[in-house]
Amino acid sequence: VRIGIDNWAPVYCIQALGWSTKDAIMTISFFEIGALLGSLSWGWLSDIMKGRRMLCSIIAVVIEFFMLISYSQVTSVYSMYTVLFILGFLVFGPQLLIGVSVIEFVPRNALAVTNGLTGTFAYLFGDSFAKVFLGYIADPTKAGMQIFGYNLHGWGATFTIMFTALIIAGLMMIPVALKQEKIIRQAKVLHL
């Protein structure tokens, strides 16, 4: 979702909404400012929640789902800037917290490799898919892409993929959140 917005928001605003290039380019600034504040805020919130980083991430993903609906519906420049600021705030929190959560699940001597693997897979699948395939699907001059017998074409299909990615991400975070909760409760019992 991050790369889908980061790379394609200006193009979406120009193609689908008929914006000027100047207004469309500014979308990234608002997204990135939200990202900076979101990374700091979600990290701080997860500390307040006593290390429940995946729970924070799940909360962010649920809110992000509804903000993505807004993103697909708003047409005015300042409404879009606001939505993209909020999306940046929401998207980058889980991205940061996933990397931090990894630390709690592996031995110290495997931290760098584990963090590297999560980053590698995020970029191999998320970044590559969003850059290549979302662009191909959204491109009005192309025929779209066949996936599981469905022809995905246009911005509506692009949003469908982003919604699907959020659902999958949220579902994948649930077992990690449950394991994290178990670790937190065990540590609490040991300290009593």
Say what each PLM segment does.
Residues 1-42, 95, 99, 126-134:
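Extracytoplasmic gate region of multi-pass secondary transporters
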Residues 27-31, 114-118, 158-161:
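Hydrophobic positions within alpha-helical transmembrane segments
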Residues 39-51, 138-139:
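Helix-to-loop junctions at the C-terminal end of transmembrane segments
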Residues 50, 102-112:
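Paired intracellular helix-loop junctions of major facilitator superfamily
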Residues 52-101:
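C-terminal transmembrane helical hairpin of 12-TM major facilitator-type secondary transporters
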Residues 53, 136-166:
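A membrane-interface helix-boundary motif in multi-pass transporters
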Residues 71-72, 155, 159-192:
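Multi-pass alpha-helical transporter architecture, strongest
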Residues 108-142:
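A late C-terminal transmembrane helix in Major Facilitator Superfamily
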